[in-house]
């Protein structure tokens, strides 16, 4: 039976990173692109509940694609239950995101990872792929989309084949892959754990011409992430980070301690 691969992202259906994934995996089976119609960065795993979703067919460099007027999670759901309703995909790949998605902070805010988490929630293994860029401003700049995806494509092809043929290890629902800026085929690939956070939060206060306050949420990158974390691996060591993730976020190690606290205080 031919493998089926659903490709999505959070940068929108026009992002070159989407086609880069398609080119990397098209030889492995039937690859289908279903992605947000517009930029959806930092929406996490949110979904649309209070307005209808629409799917528009479009041509991407000669390839049929489907644009969804919703979030990355909406795109995964529409991909599985509408576009590929006859048979679910065997793998979902989200990316290639322009800008790294590192730390536990990114897991809960990134639309790229959110799409992969929704795939896992639907019982389909998933890979989220992001590329580190050196300038923060490039993360949402159209011009920055013209990246060299060759190293990422090579890695995606290898990972996709492995997951399609063997699945993910028990207890792993998805892989979060981050490729450092300037990576080459010789760049080491390291299995990592999540850093706690990627940014120290900053809130900028401004005044509009009518004297009313408004705010921009911003941040500076954490510079002292522990060794072995995804953030340290990509930013300090300039190595490829692969972090295995699971949907169950229960802090099992502390269950007994929480039970003691409840018992002693209620």
From Swiss-Prot:
Cofactor binding notes? Binds 1 divalent metal cation per subunit.
Keyword Hydrolase listed? The answer is yes
Which family does this protein fall into? Belongs to the SurE nucleotidase family.
**What is known about what this protein does?**
Nucleotidase that shows phosphatase activity on nucleoside 5'-monophosphates.
The protein's Enzyme Commission number? 3.1.3.5
What cofactor does its activity depend on? Answer: a divalent metal cation
Q: Which residues does the record give as a divalent metal cation binding sites? A: 10-11, 41, 97
Molecular functions per Gene Ontology: 5'-nucleotidase activity; metal ion binding; nucleotide binding
Question: Any idea where this protein resides?
Answer: Cytoplasm
Q: Which organism is it from?
A: Methanocella arvoryzae (strain DSM 22066 / NBRC 105507 / MRE50)
Catalyses: a ribonucleoside 5'-phosphate + H2O = a ribonucleoside + phosphate
Give an example GO cellular component term for this record.
cytoplasm
- Record keywords: Cytoplasm, Hydrolase, Metal-binding, Nucleotide-binding
**A Pfam family per the record:** SurE
KW Glycoprotein (keyword) present: no
* Full protein name: 5'-nucleotidase SurE
């Amino acid at each position: 039976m031919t493998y089926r691969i659903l490709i999505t992202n959070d940068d929108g259906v026009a992002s070159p990173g989407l086609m880069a994934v398609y080119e990397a995996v098209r030889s492995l089976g039937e690859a289908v692109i279903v992605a947000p119609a517009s930029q959806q960065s930092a929406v996490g795993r949110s979904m649309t509940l209070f307005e209808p979703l629409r799917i528009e067919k479009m041509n991407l460099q000669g390839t049929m694609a489907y644009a969804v007027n919703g979030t990355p999670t909406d795109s995964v759901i529409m991909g599985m239950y509408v576009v590929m309703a006859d048979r679910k995909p065997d793998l979902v790949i989200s990316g290639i995101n322009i800008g790294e998605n590192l730390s536990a902070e990114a897991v809960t805010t990134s639309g790229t990872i959110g799409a992969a988490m929704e795939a896992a929630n639907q019982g389909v293994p998933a890979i989220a792929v992001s590329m580190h860029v050196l300038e923060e401003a490039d993360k949402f700049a159209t011009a920055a989309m013209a990246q060299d995806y060759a190293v990422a494509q090579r890695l995606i092809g290898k990972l996709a084949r492995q997951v399609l043929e063997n699945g993910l290890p028990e207890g792993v629902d998805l892989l979060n892959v981050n490729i450092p800026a300037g990576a080459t085929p010789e760049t080491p690939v390291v299995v990592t754990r999540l850093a706690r956070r990627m940014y120290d939060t900053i809130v900028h206060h401004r005044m509009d011409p009518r004297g009313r306050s408004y705010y921009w949420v911003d941040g500076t990158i954490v510079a002292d992430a522990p060794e072995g974390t995804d953030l340290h691996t990509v930013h300090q060591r300039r190595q490829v980070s692969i972090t295995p993730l699971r949907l169950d976020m229960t802090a099992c190690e502390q269950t007994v301690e929480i039970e003691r606290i409840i018992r002693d205080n209620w």
